Amino acid sequence: MHLSLARSAVLMLLLLFALGNFVVVQSGLITRDVDNGQLTDNRRNLQTEWNPLSLFMSRRSCNNSCQSHSDCASHCICTFRGCGAVNG
């Protein structure tokens, strides 16, 4: 039983990686408005935050410092260490 479950999990992971494209969405900040108590969404349009990922390593560098994903090249994302390749 456990072996079958493990095989299923491995198969699912292989299928995910075989697709080759994943989506990273930068989560934004949702706050409560002080005046009327309603929730406000301070995120930009999420469509602009999608970055396709690939299984293949990028040979381009991502050495910039950053505050947001828009500060990095298209193949990079902003991390706590600066711009980094989306696939590692």
From Swiss-Prot:
The protein's matches in SUPFAM superfamilies, at most eight in alphabetical order, are given as: omega toxin-like
* Cleavable signal peptide: 1-27
Question: Where is this chain primarily localised?
Answer: secreted
- Prodomain residues: 28-58
In terms of superkingdom, the source organism counts as Eukaryota
The cross-references to InterPro entries, in alphabetical order and at most eight, read: Toxin_11
What family does the database annotate?
A: Belongs to the conotoxin P superfamily.
In its UniProt entry, what is this protein called?
A: Conotoxin Gm9.1
Species annotation: Conus gloriamaris
